[in-house]
């Protein structure tokens, strides 16, 4: 599992108009090529009367699945520039479909490349991007006399308090980076004078919105 990666925040669409042609960018998170193809077919069905429904997607930890389709536009003028935007933004598990309704003015090869790239870029800006970071959920159980101290210290620490459970004892669920689990356990043990029970829970991805991603060259 990747320690962290960027992907589209959620499924959505965004439209721009260039020289009277409508370019509608549809974005979705996908985890398999089948999911990507199903998303593409869904958009094609919705926009069956569009001039083109071009697509691109990047899937896998090492981006081992990369596909681009021009859907009738001149070769290399649609799918590839769309794919390049996804790669430059360092996105994974993301599928983009750009629907074009021709407005009567030809854009030329260069114009098409810019238009399709711009459509995906602005679509990502509009819908949003998140960083998914792999975290370990740590479970800390203690007597209720420690409730206030542990909660206050957790909220002021670099660790992220997920939830508090109230039962026979009070239990804190905390998001901790995998490399910090030992440090967390030592810190919590010292904080409670050894009077807490600390266990490692499941690994999960925590999502955080990002405003800017440094693009690759």
Swiss-Prot record:
- InterPro entries cross-referenced by the UniProt entry: EFG_III/V, Impact, Impact_N, Impact_N_sf, Impact_YigZ-like, Ribosomal_Su5_D2-typ_SF, UPF0029_Impact_C, UPF0029_Impact_CS
Q: Which domain of life is it from?
A: Bacteria
A GO CC term?
Answer: cytoplasm
Gene3D superfamilies documented for this protein: Impact, N-terminal domain
Biological process (GO) annotations? regulation of translational initiation
Q: What are the coiled-coil residue ranges?
A: none
Task: Kindly indicate where the leader peptide sits in this chain.
Answer: none
Record family assignment: Belongs to the IMPACT family.
User: What NCBIfam families does the annotation carry?
Assistant: IMPACT_YIGZ
Protein name from the UniProt record = IMPACT family member YvyE
Q: Which organism is it from?
A: Bacillus subtilis (strain 168)
